[in-house]
């Protein structure tokens, strides 16, 4: 019976929004000789490629962009799901309008562009804007740790859209993921149900309640590990697969 190591990307395999290091990339290819490996991220496929390499689908047995709403196995596309068909245009517009008006009322040291990114399986909402520089990203993240900007935004969204079948979770350093209930990272597990794995190990950094790794981390189908950085991920894997 085979095992699978399933990794979050940002903060687990790479530094947030940075490319994977050669050392980590090489380590994972060695690990692949001992176990199947997969990556699951909230980001879209292009961002996974940017960070893990254009050949990501050849390097991992499973690649699950957008929490597995887009799924690749052994280099081939398995399926693609979309949010607009599921929620309907009215709910999506209400959500976008509400988020833009909320962001317009927050005073931050800096605001940039791309406050909402529309993906296949989710909306990604960023108070500072996704086009901020790396320095601006870190500045916002440090401020957010003190002032809980995203936490308050999420609490507000949960109240405003209660009963609409939506989940709001804090993702990465600068944004909030919004998706239908059940479309969190656990969604990718449905592609693995009949694959016959004895154990699915999951590694992620945002495993606390409200973090976008929490649901899959606590799911009974996985054995979850909380990591703090790629080095930590490597250390745990070396312990599991000496």
Curated annotation (Swiss-Prot):
GO biological process, one term: GDP-mannose biosynthetic process
GO molecular function: metal ion binding; phosphomannomutase activity
Main localization (coarse): cytoplasm
Residue sites binding Mg(2+) 2 per the record: 217, 219, 222
The keyword NADP is assigned to this record: no
UniProt modified residues of type N6-acetyllysine: 145
Pfam families, sorted: PMM
Organism superkingdom: Eukaryota
Keywords attached to this entry: Acetylation, Cytoplasm, Isomerase, Magnesium, Metal-binding
Cystine pairs: none
Signal sequence segment: none
Binding site for Mg(2+) 1: 8, 10, 205
Entry function: Involved in the synthesis of the GDP-mannose and dolichol-phosphate-mannose required for a number of critical mannosyl transfer reactions.
Assembly, per entry: Homodimer.
Record protein name field: Phosphomannomutase 2
Organism for this UniProt entry: Mus musculus (Mouse)
Lineage: Eukaryota, Metazoa, Chordata, Craniata, Vertebrata
